[in-house]
């Protein structure tokens, strides 16, 4: 994407995302695409709509926020549900103004100063019960939209006599996909640890396994060191130790399906003979880059292909109904031991235990710093890119068809 202006290299740039309707009657400006869910409250969507008064004469201009759950095509065939279910919709009229606007945010002040007249601020808020942006990755051969939760901000001009949004001419509307995301809490939980023991036939004493992690929360891309201690008091040999990061996606909105997918794994061929103890470490790095071809992996919602990653662990506010949260994501480390049998490989058995942890983004910069005064010279405008992903292919096709009309 090409910026529309240049700024001093010494000044920090504030990227402003803009998108203009096809008939150029309305243009929307947002300061960011990711809005943080702090569990107790969610950052509001604040922006500006630039209106061409001649082109919208006799019309009203609105901005709306929609949260939708999209079902995959396979889900429609199996359970007979519609393709999309709106979980939330809110709308505000920005032109003509219907009431005195509140104090503008720093972003809005700077944009109104930069853009001049015919600019109208808006503020859209999220209720605390909405899910975060998450989707289940389709396989490369899958066509159409995939299962997931997305958020859309829409600005549109509508005749005063029309009450239904679906009657809005596409040429007079503009849509932006945004994301609602969660970041790691400031306080970590206790150090994850699990122990398990198994009793085998013909062995008087058990096989004992202890697994521990150094902390409860890991950031995306951060190596996870797993400490494994095997105390083998049996007459059998532990032939292999394997550790996996497993992602569990619980689709709670229309069913209670669980999708458990390994997203990283490591193993050691170190053996633990009878009546001996071994302590070893295995390092795992769960990354989307190693799982791009795998169907059903939960991802943070997509805006651009390179912007996404494995879905972050879901944090649920106390008292919220889980069934409206779309897709809940959690992670655990599973450690498997392969134990020899009486007849060697033919009768080998596996035992395993799990340790939960959270995979998240680090806390962003201090909000007080992030909201420092926006200076005109630091505003860099970027056109909001059209979606070119499989899960948004249909919207792109519709947009292209509209452009050809």
UniProtKB/Swiss-Prot annotation:
GO molecular function term, any single one: G protein-coupled receptor binding
Phosphothreonine carried by residues: 234
Membrane topology: Peripheral membrane protein
Protein name: S-arrestin
One Gene Ontology term, aspect cellular component: membrane
Record-stated family: Belongs to the arrestin family.
Disease: Defects in SAG may be the cause of generalized progressive retinal atrophy (gPRA) in some breeds.
Entry superkingdom: Eukaryota
Keyword terms, alphabetized: Cell projection, Membrane, Phosphoprotein
Subunit structure: Monomer. Homodimer. Homotetramer. Interacts with RHO (via the phosphorylated C-terminus).
A Pfam family per the record: Arrestin_N
Gene Ontology process terms (BP): G protein-coupled receptor internalization; signal transduction
